[in-house]
Amino acid sequence: MNAQELRDKTPDELRDQLAALKKEAFNLRFQQATGQLENTARMRSVRRDVARVATILTEKAAAAAATE
């Protein structure tokens, strides 16, 4: 997912996506701890996606506060 696609989404959609990504990250950590994780690179990409979504949410909140 790229940042431009995320900027086109509403804050509610971004919050939903952030929750889903955090849940996936939790499941991946659990799989790694039990030795079931096959694609370890997925953990890195999910962690970066979480950061990307959180950054866009912060940008949108700052923009909304600036217009008020």
UniProtKB/Swiss-Prot annotation:
Transmembrane helix as UniProt keyword: no
Gene3D superfamilies cross-referenced by the UniProt entry: 1.10.287.310
Ranges in coiled-coil conformation: none
Keywords: Ribonucleoprotein, Ribosomal protein
Matching SUPFAM superfamilies: Ribosomal protein L29 (L29p) (SSF46561)
Protein's UniProt keywords contain Repeat: no
CC per GO annotation: cytosolic large ribosomal subunit
Pfam families: Ribosomal_L29
Listed transmembrane segments: none
Gene Ontology annotations of biological process type: translation
Family, as annotated: Belongs to the universal ribosomal protein uL29 family.
Protein name: Large ribosomal subunit protein uL29
Phylogenetic lineage: Bacteria, Pseudomonadati, Pseudomonadota, Alphaproteobacteria, Rhodobacterales
Record gene name: rpmC
